[in-house]
């Protein structure tokens, strides 16, 4: 499941002028969807137009459809390069026991597989010469998703905000994400 963050009235970050995070992520999501399709990996997009999808609904849709992997796409400041996030739960072992998972720790059972996806994507991005930071954060909706889940956030190159729209740069990012997914998909038991 590819989730282009924000949308509709939620513009996300404003990079000046008409360059908005919601538009950057939607374009990137469409490119990733095509790249995965070209690799023979079926994927779905959580939104394919400029509509608002509330945060909790994003997790609900992903969980209901039992997506193989969830990838949230973001663009933001400050910094440069690419950041790859996985969930950071307060106590994943405690959250993973019992019959029912609390909503805020639904990711517990998939956390190791999420880390494997994050590591594979990070490795592919670095192979393309990109500056990458891999981080664990207690963020939504990652904590609420029951399948392997990562977030990938682009930051501009230096002060060049327009680099967020660079076709060449984004093609490299998309190819790296797709290759990372292709590498671990079978190992983590992911479905489309």
Please place each PLM-identified region on the residue numbering:
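Short glycine-rich His-centered loop
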Residues: 1-18
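Active-site-proximal helix/loop segments of hydrolytic enzymes
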Residues: 23-192
